[in-house]
Amino acid sequence: NGFQAEISTEENDRIEAEESGEIISGAIAGDSVDSGISLFSLDYYTDSYGAQLDGNAKALYDLLVQNYVVDYSQYLDSVDFPFEFPDTITFEAVVEDGSFQRKGESYVQATDDVKTAIQAASDAFSYDYPQAFWFRGSNYGYRVSCVRDGSSSTGYRGTFKNFTFKPANREISENAHTRMGDFMDGVQNAVAELNEQTLGMDMEQKIKRIHDYICQRVTYRNDNTLWVHSAASLFLDADPAFVCEGYAKSMKIFCYYMGINCACISGTARGTSSGI
């Protein structure tokens, strides 16, 4: 985490500071060892990863879906956005000589709560919505506001507020998000074609047709870039190629828009590195 202190006092009753952090999402299976995707291995589920969330994590997840999937066209220039957690995170703040100190069990727990919520939301989003192909984590920032509080053992109560989600530096390639319009045009055209081809088919037949559609158009090729770990190539490249992760995410995208319940999972096979 990086910190930038900025003291703003009014008769020493309020002290404010700025803080920041970074998370790697489970969007790329190879990254999942460093992410919180294991949060979703704790129980059985019958719905999306996002359906397992609640509180602050669910609120941020819903924003990610709204901003990067539903309203993606509004985020082609910048993918940064401000947000607030509905469940306010507070802690017993340590203030010495008019300056907020980043220490104490209460503060450490509060910052962990922030990161856990952002991590869980990002992981669930990246697995549920691979159509946001460019996304693989984010920087985030927020302000800490400390006020005098007689009920706090330290004499001050700290609150986290004014959050900013800033994923640009974690994209699979520079400014990849700017290609979301072309990507989604490709998705919708392919879905329309598949819907026409699968009229009258049962679900099993539709799934087989989606599988064949992808395999007939894509070459398995690993060029050691993050691009081939996404579905981007199928919808953006003249000569589509990716690794198994790209195949899985393409299947997930088609199933989503064709009304077929589907989930991406990651793991290892015969001692290989993580994959989807």
Where are these regions (language model features)?
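A short, highly charged nucleic-acid-interacting micro-segment common to nuclease
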Residues: 233-247
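N-terminal accessory/pre-domain segments preceding catalytic cores
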Residues: 1-202
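Hydrophobic (often cysteine-bearing) scaffold residues that line and stabilize catalytic clefts
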Residues: 203-206, 243, 247, 251
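Generic hydrophobic secondary-structure packing signal
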Residues: 117, 206, 240, 274-275
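Alpha-helix capping and helix-loop boundary segments enriched in small/acidic/polar residues
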Residues: 178, 238-242, 266, 271
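Conserved hydrophobic/aromatic pocket- or pore-lining residues that grip, position, or stack substrates
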Residues: 210, 214, 244, 255
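Secondary-structure boundary elements
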Residues: 175-237
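Hydrophobic/aromatic-rich core segments of domains that either
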Residues: 246-276
